[in-house]
Amino acid sequence: MAAYCQAQGLDVVLAALLGAINQQPSRQQFQQQQQQQRQPQLQQQQQQQGIQQQPQGLQHQQQQFGLTQQHGQGRRQNIVQPNPASQNNNRMMLDMLLLNQIAQSNRMNTLAFIMAN
């Protein structure tokens, strides 16, 4: 692929693609990032709805001694994190650009071949 891109004069696109590939996290890292981002969102939603997570054993002890759960409004600071979906979109755009360039050069090669014969 790299040799083909260089032969077609697509060094800039190749460099951009290689940069995107080098920055691309592994599938496991990406899933961990998504999980880490979902967890605070889930906790935030639960706090806004007045739901608090407690281990099952503690809940049972509270019921045994006649204690009730307190539902309070949780306050949480909003932390802005980069959206991994936008990074994926950028990679997809680079892939589309490269494919477009390859298709265009193939058309030009086909045209030159037809003209030569």
Curated annotation (Swiss-Prot):
Stretches with biased composition (Low complexity): 27-72
Places the protein is found: Secreted
Region Disordered, residue ranges: 27-88
Keywords annotated in UniProt: Secreted
Residue ranges, compositional bias (Polar residues): 75-87
One GO location term (cellular component): extracellular region
Domain of life of the organism encoding this protein: Eukaryota
Tissues expressing the protein: Component of the acid-soluble and acid-insoluble organic matrix of calcified shell layers (at protein level).
Protein name (database record): Glutamine-rich protein
Naturally occurring in which organism (per UniProt): Haliotis asinina
